[in-house]
Amino acid sequence: MPKMKTNRSAAKRFGKTGSGKFTRRRQNLRHILTKKSAKRTRRLGQGALVDSANVKAVSRLLPYA
């Protein structure tokens, strides 16, 4: 059986923690930032975990993560 391919776009967007959870970046931090408060932009700069509903899909895209 041939090797499975990693989805490269997903590999650039998601990471995996030591405990096996997937991390992601938050949205809304690219542009139109002037109307967003400093507190909000700080919070958006922190990473987040992938929701449990999407873990199976992400793990299929990243078979070797």
Curated annotation (Swiss-Prot):
This is Large ribosomal subunit protein bL35. The gene is rpmI. GO terms for cellular component: cytosolic large ribosomal subunit. HAMAP family: Ribosomal_bL35 (MF_00514). The keyword Ribosomal protein applies. GO terms for molecular function: structural constituent of ribosome. Belongs to the bacterial ribosomal protein bL35 family. GO terms for biological process: translation. The keyword Ribosomal protein applies. Disulfide bonds: none annotated. It holds the Pfam family Ribosomal_L35p. Residues 1-28 are annotated as: Disordered. It comes from Solidesulfovibrio magneticus (strain ATCC 700980 / DSM 13731 / RS-1). The lineage of its organism: Bacteria, Pseudomonadati, Thermodesulfobacteriota, Desulfovibrionia, Desulfovibrionales. Keywords: Ribonucleoprotein, Ribosomal protein. Transmembrane segments: none annotated.
